[in-house]
Structure formats: structure tokens, C-alpha cells
């Protein structure tokens, strides 16, 4: 690991430590089997990705960050927060299907952090870019925002029933006592397609 990479990894670790309490406050603690073991840099990759490399501990993961995340402070914060939120309910399966609920939650976390650090203007430009480039993520965020407006504790309640959020079912919504429009619930539980 080069000196430059060591500095970047140290910055990532500081960001993660600083934001973990806020992420857990919003969405609950990580699933009991989840284990984060550090960051690594990849100058070639286009986006952050979780790496599952330990067969004896399938939910143990590293976060591999692209060098391009460091080109912009807003993007860096968004990328780190998104991977931190995913890390609450890591998905090691190769053929894993995420849901609108999961992807919207991930974006929601990033938006909250951007708003706190950089303000409303940065949130607007981030959401506009999302709407133009990857509308499926924008839509997922919108539905999760509806859910959390109705019940700010909804994700925490759901994850108390099913810690791995991508496995949440309609029955879990009922068990968690979450009152939400049926159509919104159905959309949240759909398989996510970007």
C-alpha cells in the first residue's frame, strides 16, 4: 500500500468512525453477523463495492473504494455513507437481489449526511444528478422518504424484525407495526433494477 493510499484509507476510516453513530441512529445497528474489516483502494474501479473474501465468515466484508471518490468531497461522503448503510445488512450472495427498500435506504442515508455537511444546495444538485443519470435510485429514495415521513423509525422497526433488510417481507411490515399505504409497501419490496 502506497503512502497516498494509506492517507486515503486513514481518511475513510475517520469518516466511517465519525458517521457510524448517525447511521445507526437512523437505521439501527448492523446485523449481528455483519463484520467490517477495513477499506482498500482500487484505482481502476468505477464505484465502491463490498468484497466478501472469507468463506468461514460469509458476512465479513471490506469496502473497496475507487480513487475517483476522492475527486469531490460530496461524492466521497455519499460513497462512504452508502457503503456504511449497506454494511448494516451485508449481502454476500453472488446472485443477490436487492429491493427498492434497501437501495432507497442507502441513498436516504447519503442524502441526510450531505444535507448536514454541505447544505440544501448540494442535496438538490445530488438529487438532480441522480434523477438524470440513474432515475431508479431517485425513485427508490423517494419511496423510502415517503416511508420515513410516515414513520421515522420504520427502518429500525423493520430491522428489529429482520436485520437483513433485503429479506424483509410484507409480514415483517405487519409484525413491526408499520402503517404505510399498501401500494408504497408493494413498491418498496420489489426487486430493484437500476
Set out the residue ranges of the language-model regions:
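Pan-zinc metallopeptidase signature
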Residues: 138-194
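Extracytoplasmic/secreted proteins, especially bacterial periplasmic and envelope-associated proteins
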Residues: 18, 79, 101, 105-109, ...
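Sec-exported extracytoplasmic/periplasmic mature domains
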Residues: 24, 28, 89, 110-118, ...
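Auxiliary, metal-adjacent structural segments of Zn-dependent hydrolase domains
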Residues: 1-70
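Active-site recognition of the HExxH zinc-binding catalytic motif
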Residues: 74-94, 103, 107, 111
Amino acid at each position: 500500500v502506497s503512502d497516498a493510499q494509506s492517507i486515503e484509507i486513514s481518511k475513510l476510516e475517520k469518516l466511517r468512525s465519525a458517521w457510524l453513530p448517525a447511521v445507526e441512529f437512523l437505521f439501527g445497528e448492523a446485523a449481528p453477523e455483519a463484520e467490517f474489516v477495513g477499506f482498500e483502494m482500487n484505482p481502476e474501479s468505477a464505484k465502491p463495492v463490498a468484497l466478501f473474501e472469507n468463506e468461514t465468515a460469509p458476512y465479513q466484508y471490506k469496502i473497496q473504494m475507487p480513487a475517483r471518490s476522492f475527486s469531490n468531497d460530496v461524492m466521497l461522503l455519499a460513497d462512504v455513507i452508502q457503503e456504511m448503510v449497506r454494511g448494516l445488512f451485508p449481502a454476500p450472495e453472488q446472485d443477490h437481489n436487492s429491493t427498492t427498500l434497501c437501495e432507497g435506504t442507502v441513498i436516504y442515508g447519503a442524502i441526510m449526511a450531505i444535507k448536514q455537511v454541505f447544505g440544501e444546495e448540494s442535496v438538490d444538485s445530488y438529487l438532480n444528478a441522480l434523477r438524470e443519470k440513474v432515475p431508479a435510485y431517485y425513485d427508490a429514495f423517494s419511496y423510502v422518504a415517503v416511508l420515513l415521513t410516515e414513520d421515522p423509525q420504520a427502518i429500525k422497526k423493520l430491522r428489529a424484525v429482520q436485520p437483513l433488510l433485503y429479506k424483509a417481507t410484507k409480514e415483517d411490515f405487519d409484525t413491526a407495526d408499520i402503517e404505510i399505504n399498501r401500494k408504497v409497501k408493494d413498491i418498496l419490496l420489489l426487486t430493484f433494477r437500476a
